[in-house]
From Swiss-Prot:
Region feature (Disordered): 50-75
Biological function: One of the primary rRNA binding proteins, this protein initially binds near the 5'-end of the 23S rRNA. It is important during the early stages of 50S assembly. It makes multiple contacts with different domains of the 23S rRNA in the assembled 50S subunit and ribosome.
Gene name of this polypeptide: rplD
Organism (species): Rickettsia felis (strain ATCC VR-1525 / URRWXCal2) (Rickettsia azadi)
Similarity comment text for this entry: Belongs to the universal ribosomal protein uL4 family.
Subunit: Part of the 50S ribosomal subunit.
Name of the protein: Large ribosomal subunit protein uL4
Keywords on record: Ribonucleoprotein, Ribosomal protein, RNA-binding, rRNA-binding
A single BP term in Gene Ontology: translation
Cellular component terms (Gene Ontology): ribonucleoprotein complex; ribosome
Transmembrane parts of this sequence: none
GO MF entry, a single one: structural constituent of ribosome
Amino acid sequence: MKTKILSLANEEVGEISLNEDIFAVEFIRDDIIKQVIDWQRAKAMSGNHKTKTVSEVSGTTKKPFKQKGTGNARQGSLRSVQMRGGGVAHGPRVRSHATKLPKKVRKLGLIHALSEKFAEGKLLVIDSLKLDKPKTSVLVNILNKFQGKSFFVIDGNEVDTNFSLAAKNIYNTVIVPQIGANVYDIIRHEYVLLSQEAVSVLEERLR
């Protein structure tokens, strides 16, 4: 399967053959894509939420009032969960939200996400992702030629420093080396731009 190679000026400069098993899967499995995105988002959660229990909250251990004769319900501590300023029962604890997902499913998710973008006409192959200077204004003008609202840019094994620096201040534009290609960013950005090197490395990686 062949597709156009574009320059950063959005002009056709050649053709490239793409592996249909990676970029043109016939039946897109949205369930797999969602499964991988859920796995990614859960793994990214910090999980540092925490409340103090009765044993951790600050306060006296003295009995509030005597056991009998006051007419009140008996109390043993001012730090109990029912007391104002007391501990919290069954509150959130520091934990990892990460779940396990087989590598084969993760690989399938990436393949189906790339295929979905290609089917939409939103996956473009660029001849080179290199800039002479790390100028944000230059990169903004380049991206405007593609008429997209957000871009996920995937380069080869290494990212051009000038391109990376220029993209840092651009809203909804992310550039990563091929190892950083992931389902969540592919789906949430309108356009996916791949360098020629990224295509060959991804095909080798996902074969």
